[in-house]
Amino acid sequence: ALALLMLMMTITPMPASAQGTGNSIIINEILVSANNANYGGTDWNGDGSMGNYNDQYVELYNPTTEPIDIGGWYLDDIADGGSPACSIKWNTILQPGEYITFFRAWTQIEFDYWDGDTIRILDGNMNEIDSVNYPGEDSDWDIPYGYDASGNWAKLVDGSPTPGGSNDQQWVGVANVVQGNCYPPQDHIHRGEYILEGRVVTMESYDSIIDDGRILVVDGMIEAVWSASD
């Protein structure tokens, strides 16, 4: 492990991809109320359980013709309330036409049945890229919200959840679902990724100093150290 003394450091958020601005990534589908095994439920995230909160999900879609790096972006629910935002794993790249699904088991974001909620995706600077909402006491068992054939956001009462695929097609199956990682805050333990900038003393020798250094921290652990001139 590297022993480092960090002086005059500032925290800089990981930059968002320039391609991700302008509402290029969309929230394509969400599931609020997952059915249980007694009523024909499905284990949507493949963790061995049905009908629990871990199967709530938000599905993102890249409708553009270019790959978009959403690493360091955030998923959140209603602004100034609800659950804490989670930070999407660095280097999460969504290819053109690709879907990625984030389950509550990773995000820890609760979709509120009673009061309804707003689900949002934000870039690395906390600028809102897209958002959707649903009313309170409205979600039905295994009935998702998503974009219908007319391109309207609606409760898809004539369909079933399709995490990882198009809303008007049969579900691709859990083995084919690209599941994303999103790190929520956990008490005093930092989860997520950020870069420290400043003068770094590496402690490898008394004169081992990087005047304009960078340190990548992932989940509270130092992953890389380099000079800005590298």
Task: For the regions a language model picked out, list residue spans one by one.
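Bacterial N-terminal signal peptides
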Residues: 2-11
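N-terminal metal-binding scaffold of metallo-dependent hydrolase/deaminase domains
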Residues: 183-230
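Intrinsically disordered, low-complexity linkers and terminal tails enriched in Ser/Thr/Pro/Gly
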Residues: 5-6, 16-187
